[in-house]
Each structure stands twice: as structure tokens, then as C-alpha cells.
């Protein structure tokens, strides 16, 4: 049995979006054989009341939380101009979190410190300084450099997005350096897919192995529609897109589909069968760029759903 300290960017319960889903099920899997301590940021509406996070409490020997640090546009601009780090390296950098991490490392002998996501990668420096014997696992939830590069290419296609493209161009260079450093500084690197592994391997010039740990969910924990007794009040849609709708790749995907594909689907189906077509965009926190889709015939932007 190993003693593992896991660092997460938000409390991974309830697991309601990609990051928290991955982190919760990683914790659940590791807890079967190892002793888990969790240090997590706590978002504004998250609760640490025992009844609210009972499944997470059952998996962890100890849970510590720190509020997400406030960060406004002025702070982001200052960091952009006065440092060489990428925006993501500043997003969750917190003196309170660093103090709590330092305390946990000083008070305990952790075999492994597992860092979930690039926003927390600067913690590597603290682990090296305070607990040099601890092995560091860096779980790179996205191949962030490649993701930002694709954002840049997407924005370059639209003159109205050229300011965003300029920002992305700066971030690509900074992320390349930072992500390479984080991967090289860790004792082990994990990612979510073979495609991400190839991107990270290229970034590292294949000097360090990258292990794929796919995302997973417990399908038995979700009620199937077949179990519902009354279907009469359920809305039905021909097409459904599900995802966290303030996540940039999801926003870009939905807008592209709406502009390039959706009109053709509606027209062809109406011409061939006389049927109208409906499309639901399902997911929490819809970005402001999606507002224009609410006016499209047949399109529903739901926001959060149970």
C-alpha cells in the first residue's frame, strides 16, 4: 500500500464534468489498494459538508480544501505582460494552496504526489523542495500545447477573432515550454488517450514515456431510460450534443456544426421526408458565443440538466 497525495483543481465530487469525472474515478480506483489524501481547490458553489461529499470522504483518509483564488482581467493582463508563464500556470496559483501543500508534505511521508492537470503543475517545485523522496505523477488532462495551437488556427479563420488569435499565439509558445518542463520534471506522466500520448511524446522528443489512462465512469451508477415509468413528459430530439458548454473546443465544435452542417441536415430531411429536425445542445454554463444559436429554428440550448 502506498501513501498518495492527490492535488485537484476542484473538489471531484459530485463528478459532473470531464475533470471531476476523471479525478473521482481515479481516486476511487486508487483507494482500493492505497491510502489517499486529497488537497483540492474549492469552487464557489461546492460544499464540503459530509452529507454532500460522502462518497468522496469514504475513499480518502483526509481531505483538505482551499478556495479558488480570485483573478480578474487586470491581474491576467499584468501576468501576461510581466511573466513568461502561460495563462494556465497562473490560473490556480495560490499562496494559501502552497502553504497547505507545504504543511501536508512536512507532516506526512507520501510515496507519491499525483498532480491532476497543468493548472497545478507549479506544485512540482514545492514537492521537490519539501519532499524530494516523493515520486511525482503528472496527469496531463489535455495535450495543452496542441489544444492551444488548434485554438489559434480556428481563430485565424475569422477576422473578428484575430485578437483572440494573437493571444493564442503567445500562449502556444509559453505552453510549449511549460508543458515540456512539467512533463520532464515529473517521475511519471499520464494522459487520457493515445492521441494525446503522441502529442506529448513529440513535445518531449520521446525522451520520457507517457502512459495512457483512459477516462471512465461507472455505468451502473446511472439510471437508464428504460427504468423510467413515465416517458410522456420527456423532450425528444433528433440530434443531441452533450458537453461542458463553456469549454472552448465544445463551443467551437457546436458553432461550426451550426454554421456548416445543421442547415443542410434540416433542408435535406425536410425535402426528403417532410419532417422538421430538432437539435439539443446539452451542458452546463453555455458560453456567451452560443447565444445566437438560441434563435435558430429547431435548436435548444438547455444549460444544466439533471
Predicted regions and their residues:
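N-terminal subdomain of nucleotide-sugar transferases
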Residues: 1-64, 108, 272
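Active-site proximal beta-strand in glycosyltransferases
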Residues: 2-4, 129-160
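Conserved donor-binding/catalytic core segment of Leloir-type glycosyltransferases
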Residues: 5, 231-254, 258, 262
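A short beta-strand/loop micro-motif in the catalytic core of glycosyltransferases
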Residues: 37, 113-114, 184-193
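Conserved nucleotide-sugar donor-binding subdomain of glycosyltransferases
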Residues: 68-122, 126, 162-185
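Acidic anion/phosphate-binding donor-loop and adjacent secondary structure
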Residues: 149-150, 201, 217-233, 291
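Carbohydrate-associated surface elements
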Residues: 195, 216
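Nucleotide-activated donor-binding/catalytic signature segment of Leloir-type glycosyltransferases, i.e.
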Residues: 268-306
Amino acid at each position: 500500500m502506498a501513501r498518495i497525495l492527490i492535488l485537484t483543481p476542484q473538489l471531484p465530487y459530485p463528478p459532473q464534468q470531464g475533470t471531476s469525472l476523471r479525478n473521482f474515478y481515479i481516486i476511487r480506483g486508487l483507494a482500493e489498494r492505497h491510502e489517499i489524501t486529497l488537497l483540492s481547490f474549492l469552487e464557489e458553489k461546492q460544499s464540503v459538508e459530509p452529507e454532500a461529499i460522502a462518497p468522496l470522504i469514504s475513499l480518502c483518509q483526509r481531505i483538505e480544501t482551499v478556495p479558488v483564488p480570485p483573478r480578474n482581467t487586470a491581474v491576467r493582463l499584468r501576468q501576461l505582460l510581466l511573466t513568461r508563464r502561460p495563462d494556465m500556470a497562473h490560473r490556480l496559483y495560490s499562496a494559501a494552496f502552497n502553504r497547505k501543500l507545504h504543511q501536508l508534505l512536512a507532516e506526512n511521508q507520501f510515496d507519491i504526489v499525483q498532480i491532476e492537470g497543468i493548472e497545478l503543475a507549479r506544485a512540482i517545485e514545492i514537492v521537490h523542495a519539501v519532499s524530494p523522496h516523493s515520486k511525482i505523477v503528472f496527469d496531463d488532462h489535455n495535450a495543452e500545447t496542441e489544444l492551444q495551437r488548434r485554438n489559434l488556427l480556428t481563430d485565424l479563420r475569422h477576422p473578428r477573432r484575430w485578437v483572440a488569435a494573437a493571444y493564442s499565439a503567445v500562449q502556444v509558445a509559453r505552453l510549449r515550454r511549460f508543458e515540456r518542463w512539467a512533463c520532464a520534471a515529473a517521475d511519471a506522466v499520464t494522459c487520457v488517450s493515445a492521441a494525446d500520448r503522441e502529442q506529448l511524446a513529440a513535445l518531449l522528443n520521446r525522451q520520457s514515456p507517457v502512459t495512457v489512462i483512459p477516462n471512465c465512469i461507472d455505468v451502473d451508477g446511472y439510471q437508464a431510460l428504460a427504468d423510467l415509468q413515465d416517458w410522456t413528459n420527456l423532450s425528444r430530439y433528433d440530434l443531441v450534443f452533450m458537453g461542458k458548454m463553456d469549454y472552448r473546443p465544445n463551443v467551437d465544435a457546436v458553432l461550426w456544426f451550426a454554421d456548416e452542417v445543421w442547415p443542410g441536415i434540416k433542408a435535406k430531411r425536410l425535402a426528403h421526408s417532410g419532417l422538421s429536425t430538432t437539435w439539443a445542445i446539452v451542458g452546463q454554463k453555455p458560453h456567451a458565443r452560443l447565444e445566437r444559436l438560441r434563435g435558430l429554428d429547431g435548436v435548444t440550448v438547455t444549460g444544466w440538466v439533471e
